[in-house]
Amino acid sequence: MVKQIDSKDAFQEALDAAGDKLVVVDFSATWCGPCKMIKPFFHSLSEKYSNVVFLEVDVDDCQDVASECEVKCMPTFQFFKKGQKVGEFSGANKEKLEATINEFV
């Protein structure tokens, strides 16, 4: 399941609640073509990796979160463990997304 983040507080709470689990954050926008293309794959990964927390942040709805996380383009995927960012990449690259999850799990 992918959790929609709607505020900076909700983002921090989700990171805190994850504990030792890997957190994968998809920063996207409704008007972004590549974001729309990879979204179903991102959701399918959330079913496949039940021990990983998947979050979605709409950069237009949560500009403060996107700014704090220094998101420059969409889609950007960031990876967190114990509240700390451990990885990041931009672009709708399915293979890289799954490989990066496997690297940190």
From Swiss-Prot:
GO molecular function of the protein, one example?
protein-disulfide reductase activity
Where it sits in the cell: the answer is: Nucleus; Cytoplasm; Secreted
| InterPro entries recorded | Thioredoxin (IPR005746), Thioredoxin-like_sf (IPR036249), Thioredoxin_CS (IPR017937), Thioredoxin_domain (IPR013766)
**An example Gene Ontology CC term for this record:** cytoplasm
Question: What positions are marked as the site Contributes to redox potential value?
Answer: G33, P34
Tell me which UniProt keywords the record has, alphabetically. Answer: Acetylation, Activator, Cytoplasm, Disulfide bond, Electron transport, Nucleus, Redox-active center, S-nitrosylation, Secreted, Transcription, Transcription regulation, Transport
Disulfide pattern: C32-C35
What are the N6-succinyllysine sites (modified residues) in this protein? K8, K94
What sequence ranges are listed for the domain Thioredoxin? 2-105
What's the PTM story here?
In the fully reduced protein, both Cys-69 and Cys-73 are nitrosylated in response to nitric oxide (NO). When two disulfide bonds are present in the protein, only Cys-73 is nitrosylated. Cys-73 can serve as donor for nitrosylation of target proteins.
What GO biological process terms are annotated to this protein in UniProt? Answer: positive regulation of DNA binding; response to radiation
The modified positions for N6-acetyllysine read: K3, K39, K94
Q: Which residues form the active site?
A: C32 (nucleophile), C35 (nucleophile)
Q: Tell whether Cytoplasm is among the UniProt keywords.
A: yes
Q: Which domain of life, per UniProt?
A: Eukaryota
Site location (Deprotonates C-terminal active site Cys): D26
User: Which protein family is it in?
Assistant: Belongs to the thioredoxin family.
Indicate the quaternary assembly: Homodimer; disulfide-linked. Interacts with TXNIP through the redox-active site. Interacts with MAP3K5 and CASP3. Interacts with APEX1; the interaction stimulates the FOS/JUN AP-1 DNA-binding activity in a redox-dependent manner.
Q: What does the UniProt record say this protein does?
A: Participates in various redox reactions through the reversible oxidation of its active center dithiol to a disulfide and catalyzes dithiol-disulfide exchange reactions. Plays a role in the reversible S-nitrosylation of cysteine residues in target proteins, and thereby contributes to the response to intracellular nitric oxide. Nitrosylates the active site Cys of CASP3 in response to nitric oxide (NO), and thereby inhibits caspase-3 activity.
What's the protein name?
Answer: Thioredoxin
Q: Which organism is it from?
A: Callithrix jacchus (White-tufted-ear marmoset)
Gene that encodes it: TXN
